[in-house]
Amino acid sequence: QRGGGNYESFSGDLSSYDFSEWFRRGYNQQARYGWLKSEMFSDKAKVVYEFESFYNHSSYIYPALADFQRSLGAQAAAMWHYSMTDYAQYNGGSHVFNLKTTPAKAAAFAVASKVFQNTPILQNYHVESPSNFQSQNFSYSLKKNRSIYSDDSYFFYSNDVLDMGKMITSKSPKEIFGYGKSPLVNYEGTGTYQLKISEKEIIVHIQPDVVYNHSLSYRSKRKKHLITEFENQKKHAMTISIDGWESGKFTIFKLTETGKKKKIKGIKELRLKIAPGKYKITKT
């Protein structure tokens, strides 16, 4: 509507727009997506061709889409767009997605993958609240601009989730992928991070801080202007709070691209001052 119905005329940010009515109509109306629930298509494969949003860089929309699509019987979904890092910094507009340049979306996409994998197809859809929802294992919220997936092995989230509501988080997951602060990891940087946790070691992978020169909705003509820039050297505080790693003797190693490791220091608790990169933390 803002672009007069013309795709090329639209310019803006729909991250805070409430798509609740779109979800309701899509689910309830036969002429939209309701036909997918009919008996005629009950034995047909259902694949989402474009799993993507439009001028939306929020932390909730991808998990909301995954939940909606599973309720319609979708068995697989293909991501519509991914900007390779070499040119992602110049990319803005309707479809922008990259691990480094769009950390909130990247973390939300990780949440969405778990929602899609672990939500039964054709479950009853919550049409009364399609943009703000919480189940036992996942939640997403337009109001709080965040999303969470949590089970015994995984804890994924996008944006600060210090208040988990009624969700119960495992204190000993095998993998954490996040953007922002959470009860398990408090990280002050602006990139995503990933922790892979075993009994005796933690592999930590931190993406660089991202600095925005323009809105992600900005279209750089001929890709001449840097939309985003990276800060690779700045150190930030990171506190890790998981069972079995509360205190003791730990050693931190910096891992190189060739797989070699360089000892940084020994510590007694997982309160770090750390720059982007890949690290190994071991119990001594």
Sequence positions of predicted segments:
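Substrate-binding cleft of secreted/luminal carbohydrate-active enzymes
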Residues: Y55-Q134
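A general structural signal for short secondary-structure junctions and capping/turn motifs
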Residues: K37-E39, F68-R70, L195
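Hard-cation-handling environments
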Residues: S141-D151, F156, L162
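Glycoside hydrolase catalytic-domain groove-lining segments
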Residues: Q1-Y55
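C-terminal beta-sandwich/jelly-roll accessory domains of carbohydrate-active enzymes
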Residues: F156-T284
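Mature, folded catalytic cores of secreted/periplasmic enzymes
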Residues: Q1-G3, G12-D13, R70, Y90-P120, ...
